[in-house]
Amino acid sequence: QADSKQRSIYFFHSNNERNLFLTTFDEALVTDCYRREQSIVPQQALAMTNSRLVLDVSRPIADFITKVLQTRQGDTDEAFIREAFRYLLAQQPSEPELQDCLKTLDEWQKLPEAGKDAAATSFARANLVWVLLNHHDFFTVR
């Protein structure tokens, strides 16, 4: 499963055949009938954050968005954030989200592992895409 490109897991889950893997991810009890609220357990968040798929696609997605911006409206950090939100979450960032992302991109570009100039920008943008791929609105169907 580690190499899978599919981010959904389907199990048959009944009172007689409980899948123990689901206990790690806050399983729904099959003997109860109730409306489930949003929940997350630390293991679920860590599985998503450390997913090889997310790590592998963050840089190519960031590069794609950058190329789109270079051909259209100009390649600024603000434009990148807006396009990344639109592309990955199908929504625009709120003003506080936009400001937080701008500040965070700036901080990531200053990290020693970011490199210099274009490499630092690419590093920071890939990190932002990685964050958005782990955003609740990315992997939850409402």
Question: Which residues does each PLM region occupy?
Answer:
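An acidic, gly/pro-interrupted, aromatic-rich
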Residues: 1-88, 92, 132-142
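Hydrophobic (often cysteine-bearing) scaffold residues that line and stabilize catalytic clefts
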Residues: 54, 77, 81, 97, ...
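Alpha-helix boundary/capping detector
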Residues: 71, 110-111
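Amphipathic alpha-helical segments that form the core helices of the histone-fold
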Residues: 99-110
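Intrinsically disordered, low-complexity Ser/Thr- and acidic-rich flexible linkers and loops
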Residues: 113-117
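Globin-like tetrapyrrole-binding proteins
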Residues: 128
